[in-house]
């Protein structure tokens, strides 16, 4: 699944600084720490979720000094990091559902493009963006186009190294293609 991918990439590419946006209970934070990352900054707007994330870091035996948890708005934080000149080796964007149906797709596309554009600007050359959508109203092809456009607007080029979908515990039935709502791209910046 995607957390295992994070740990694998971290081990192989020796990430030092990771930014986990919309971290919820810290699944990607813990995976990055398992992969040997130096420090993870995790952002979510839910205090209770951040408390669980910090507890998960502790339950996995990691030193809390290797993490920073921010109870904040992700968009505002990305803009703030940009104005501060912060750079990260890897960034995870795993937002909540922006488009529950196709009728919300246009608004959601703008939101996905904005967070991806901001993230690309914070990504170090050779860094990796793990970007996800769980919106049924956004197709995998549209999501690819959104991310590509965000990179272009940020002045960043890269390679899609993997396309990700649901884990084995999220099967899709033959007669319900809308069930393919989980999608992700792993993009390595040039």
Task: Write out the residue ranges for each language-model feature.
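SAM-dependent Rossmann-like transferase core, predominantly class I methyltransferases
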Residues: 1-16
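Conserved class I S-adenosyl-L-methionine
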Residues: 14-24
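Conserved SAM-binding loop of SAM-dependent methyltransferases across substrates and taxa
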Residues: 25-38
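Conserved SAM-binding motif I beta-strand of class I
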Residues: 39-44
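S-adenosyl-L-methionine
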Residues: 48-92
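Mobile active-site "lid"/loop adjacent to the S-adenosyl-L-methionine
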Residues: 88-118
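C-terminal catalytic and target-recognition region of SAM-dependent MTase-like enzymes
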Residues: 114, 128-190
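Helix-to-beta-strand junctions that scaffold the AdoMet/dcAdoMet cofactor pocket
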Residues: 123-125
């Amino acid at each position: 699944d995607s957390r295992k991918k994070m740990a694998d990439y971290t081990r192989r590419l020796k990430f030092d600084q990771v930014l986990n946006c919309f971290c919820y209970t810290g699944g990607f934070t813990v995976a990055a720490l398992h992969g040997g990352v130096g420090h993870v900054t995790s952002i979510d707007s839910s205090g209770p979720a951040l408390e669980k994330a910090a507890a998960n870091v502790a339950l996995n035996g990691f030193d809390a000094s290797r993490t920073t948890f921010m109870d904040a708005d992700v968009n505002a934080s990305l803009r703030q990091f940009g104005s501060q000149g912060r750079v990260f080796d890897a960034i995870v964007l795993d937002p909540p559902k922006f488009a529950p149906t196709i009728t919300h797709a246009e608004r959601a596309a703008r939101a996905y493009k904005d967070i991806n554009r901001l993230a690309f600007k914070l990504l170090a050359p050779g860094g990796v963006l793990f970007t996800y959508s769980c919106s049924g109203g956004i197709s995998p092809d549209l999501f690819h186009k959104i991310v590509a456009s965000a990179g272009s607007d940020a002045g960043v080029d890269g390679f899609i190294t993997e396309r990700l979908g649901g884990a084995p515990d999220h099967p899709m039935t033959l007669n319900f293609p809308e069930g393919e709502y989980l999608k992700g791209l792993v993009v390595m910046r040039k």
